[in-house]
């Protein structure tokens, strides 16, 4: 597959569960990345591109207790864990009752805090929303803002996958098993063309497309559009567009050494900087300035862990 990157082995901690999952950890990982989000319709697919963001196998022998934060994204993670449970909570700090092992989590228009109390060993499949709908063949409203244990699905394929991954001797072997499973499960399935149209329009416009225009193009009412989007993605088109615009702001901020928040707000079609701040508080749980400060610290830790720190 020409769109698949080489598998790399690093002491790495980037872009895991979503934007910031693993950055505070000294983690060994191997990852396969797939192509971008563009979706050719139809069932004659030879690639997982557009259905799977990537697959990562993580391992660490020891870990100091830590809490990391995931901000709103378009990743639907499937986690198969081989070690201690995580503690995970939406829009708050996780408590003792928030433990979970292997799970799937749908889209969430907010942030998620993840706590680790012991060693981490897992395989993570990052599905796109379109890929997740095909993978589970169930309405994505069943997963939105939820952590669903994999055992709850009573899915023979998932149980077999978990067993094979658990028996695998290396991270590379786990990746090969996961790719083969995804190809069997996803390739050959027809993508819902109307869901793909809505998804592509929102992503291509970075959240600025008028939802009324989409309903007109499809010949639907607003009510029908909202119902179809909730089934396909787990949230309404308007909410999807807000997250897409927020993600565009994140991309611009990450590409700048010192983000110009007023300029970013204008470039992302926010009404003003206060509007941008409101979305950051909703989707990241903190102000843009606080988010920027925290991510800079995390990048510095990552560079220290990989030996890529600035020369002193």
Where are the regions that the model predicts?
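Functionally critical mobile loop/hinge segments
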Residues: 281, 286
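DNA major-groove recognition helix of helix-turn-helix
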Residues: 229, 241, 280, 292
